[in-house]
């Protein structure tokens, strides 16, 4: 039973790592962001006037 739980935990962590590293999930700092349909990667935010992801 412990082995099954451990395998499920490892599978869940692996799936989370793959989903977190998806390059199409968010826009990098400096990317055009208005009317793209994707959010800027944290901690950047979309500046509507500059049409760019800006931030720290």
UniProtKB/Swiss-Prot annotation:
This is U-limacoditoxin(3)-Dv21. It is found in: Secreted. Residues 1-19 form the signal peptide. GO terms for molecular function: calcium channel inhibitor activity; toxin activity. The lineage of its organism: Eukaryota, Metazoa, Ecdysozoa, Arthropoda, Hexapoda. GO terms for cellular component: extracellular region. Disulfide bonds join 26-41, 33-46, 40-53. Belongs to the limacoditoxin-22 family. The presence of a 'disulfide through disulfide knot' structurally defines this protein as a knottin. Its main location: secreted. Expressed by the venom secretory cell of the spine. The spine is a cuticular structure containing a single large nucleated venom-secreting cell at its base. It is an independent unit capable of producing, storing and injecting venom. On the back of D.vulnerans caterpillars, spines are grouped together by 50 to 100 to form scoli, of which there are eight in D.vulnerans. It holds the Pfam family Toxin_30. SUPFAM superfamilies: omega toxin-like. Probable toxin. Shows a moderate antiparasitic activity against the major pathogenic nematode of ruminants (H.contortus, IC(50)=22.1 uM). Does not show insecticidal activities. Does not induce increase in intracellular calcium in mouse DRG neurons, suggesting that it does not induce pain. Keywords: Disulfide bond, Knottin, Secreted, Signal, Toxin. InterPro entries: Assassin_bug_toxin-like. It comes from the Eukaryota.
């Amino acid at each position: 039973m412990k082995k099954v739980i451990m395998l499920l935990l490892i599978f869940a962590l692996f799936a989370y790592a793959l989903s977190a590293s998806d390059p199409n999930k968010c826009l990098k700092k400096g990317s055009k962001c208005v009317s793209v349909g994707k959010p800027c990667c944290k901690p950047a935010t979309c500046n509507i006037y500059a049409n760019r992801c800006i931030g720290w």
